[in-house]
Each structure stands twice: as structure tokens, then as C-alpha cells.
């Protein structure tokens, strides 16, 4: 199995050929929540419209590199627009724009898993009890769940060879648990990898078992600390990951087995340049669906001045 880490931009994955990937599993950056560092990062200090359209460039690239008939799985949660930034609370359903774009780009939406978890990021605005407690009317729901959106690229998928098919057989208990509409397991603790948005290995592990065969290739365009690559390695799949911030490379290499503990691990690290603003604007104009926010939220303050918008604590070698 081979594992390729590209220090580069998911909006233009030049190192991944057309229809060469069998599954995409990812969790994109939140909007205005954390400064992930690196030129070309998506979500921090962007307008909501720019954030959605930059994500759409990545989803368009995912469609290009996916084999026909294969799955794109996106872990995303709703977010609050915080009153400290915008003057009022409002839930932002990011998933609705992802579904709208992916359907327009040539995916079928195949439903969603609702993942109930203890969140690793303060998507509710940073408080345990929100709203008018202890009095009615203005209480605010706690966002202790996220969605795993499932899309299928149109067309006929490649046929696995008999040995890979047999090696990928699932038990009836696995099938019933994984293909249920609700999952319940905890998110990864922040202190374990010091990457604040990390998801647990169980999440990509389930999706890789559900939607790929042994020996196939899994892509994560927002690799982060490398959890999807770890799950792919442990399940006998090859993997490719794009990550804009090279500071995550030491922990990614350890998860991929480049520390020498796993003799069969072949890890390649490539470099690519981030998409510049002009090229990104041109690419957006070519999208099948360009998002325009009908009711823009006017930002009252710069998130870089608040702790909610601080830079993440990076993994150190």
C-alpha cells in the first residue's frame, strides 16, 4: 500500500489524476472558527459566500478524481454565527449548501448519518448553557451532533477482483451498525493530537469499510492530523491526503507508518503551490453553481481578535 501526503491546496489537486480514487472521506474546516495557518486556507477571515465557494472548488475536484459510481463522504456540523462577531445568534446550516452544490455538480445525494458526539470545537458559541436559562422562549439548542453526508458520483463503479471482494466482506452486525442512520461515539479528545478539529479513527474506519474494497485508494482533501490516512492504512487501503499546513506533517507521517514501525508502509510527501486569488476566482466562475448569500451577515469584529479565532496548537516533532 502507498500513502501520499501533498502539502498543497484541495481546490486544485494537480497530483491526483482523473478517476483514480475510489472513496473520498473528509471533514472540511469550519467557517470562522479556527485559524489553521498556511496560505490559501479556507474558512478563516472569509465571508460566508467565499467560504462556501472555496469548499465547492474542493468538491468539484473530488468529483474529477473519483471513479464513477464511487462515494464522497463529508463530515460537517451546523454552526452558530456568534453574537460577539455578528450581533445576533443564528444557526448556519452549512450542509444545505454542500448538498445543493454536489447535486448540481454530478453527484447523487444518498442521505446522511447523524453522528451524536461530544464536540471537539465550540460550534455552539463557547458556552455550556446557551440562551435565556432558566426562563423560556430564548433557549438555544446544543449542537452535540454532526452530519456525515453521503454522495455517489454518477456512473458504473470499477469491479473489484474476487480476492479483494472477499477480503472486504462485512459481518451482519457490522452492516446493521454501520448502515444505521444514527451513530453514537465520542469525538477525539483535543489533547491527544493537539489538533483541535481532529475526528476519531472510528469515523473514517466505518466509511472505508462501507464504501471501498481492500487495495483501493482513499482520498482526504482536508487531511489535518492524518486520521483518515491512519484508518486507510489499518484497513489495507492506499491513501492520498492534501493538507495546506506543513506543520502537521510530523504527526501525519507517524500515523501513516513512516516512522519505520510498519515495514509495508510507503509514504511519499509532495509539494504543491496554493491556488492564488486570481486563479481561485476564475475557477469559481466555471463552477456549475456559484453560491451567493441572500442575507449576508455583517461582521461586527475581526475573529482574529477573539480567542475563538485563535490559531490552532500545531503538532510538533
Language model regions located:
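Compositionally biased amphipathic helical and low-complexity segments enriched in hydrophobic
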Residues: 24, 236, 250, 262-263, ...
Amino acid at each position: 500500500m502507498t500513502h501520499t501526503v501533498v502539502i498543497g491546496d484541495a481546490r486544485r489537486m494537480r497530483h491526483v489524476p482523473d478517476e483514480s480514487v475510489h472513496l473520498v472521506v473528509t471533514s472540511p474546516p469550519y467557517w470562522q472558527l479556527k485559524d489553521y495557518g498556511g496560505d490559501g486556507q479556507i474558512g478563516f477571515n472569509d465571508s460566508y459566500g467565499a467560504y462556501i465557494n472555496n469548499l465547492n472548488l474542493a468538491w468539484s475536484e473530488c468529483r474529477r478524481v473519483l471513479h464513477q459510481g464511487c462515494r464522497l463522504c463529508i463530515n460537517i456540523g451546523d454552526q452558530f454565527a456568534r453574537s460577539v462577531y455578528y450581533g445576533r445568534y443564528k444557526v448556519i446550516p452549512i450542509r444545505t449548501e454542500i448538498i445543493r452544490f454536489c447535486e448540481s455538480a454530478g453527484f447523487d445525494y444518498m442521505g446522511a448519518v447523524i453522528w451524536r458526539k461530544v464536540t471537539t470545537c465550540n460550534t455552539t458559541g463557547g458556552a455550556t448553557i446557551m440562551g435565556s436559562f432558566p426562563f423560556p422562549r430564548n433557549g438555544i439548542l446544543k449542537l452535540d451532533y454532526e452530519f456525515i453526508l453521503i454522495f455517489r458520483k454518477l456512473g458504473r463503479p470499477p469491479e473489484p477482483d474476487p480476492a479483494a471482494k472477499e477480503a472486504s466482506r462485512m459481518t451482519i452486525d457490522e452492516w446493521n451498525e454501520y448502515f444505521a442512520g444514527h451513530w453514537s461515539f465520542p469525538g477525539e479528545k483535543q489533547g491527544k493530537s493537539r489538533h483541535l478539529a481532529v475526528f476519531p479513527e472510528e469515523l473514517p474506519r466505518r466509511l472505508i469499510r462501507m464504501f471501498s474494497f481492500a487495495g483501493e485508494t482513499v482520498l482526504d482533501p482536508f487531511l489535518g492530523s492524518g486520521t483518515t490516512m491512519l484508518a486507510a492504512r489499518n484497513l489495507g487501503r492506499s491513501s492520498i491526503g492534501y493538507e495546506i499546513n506543513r506543520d502537521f506533517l510530523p504527526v501525519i507521517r507517524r500515523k501513516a507508518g513512516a516512522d519505520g514501525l510498519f515495514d509495508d508502509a510507503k509514504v511519499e510527501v509532495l509539494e504543491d503551490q496554493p491556488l492564488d486569488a486570481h486563479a481561485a476566482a476564475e475557477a469559481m466562475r466555471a463552477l456549475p453553481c456559484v453560491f451567493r448569500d441572500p442575507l449576508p451577515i455583517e461582521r461586527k469584529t475581526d475573529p482574529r481578535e477573539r480567542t475563538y479565532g485563535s490559531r490552532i496548537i500545531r503538532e510538533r516533532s
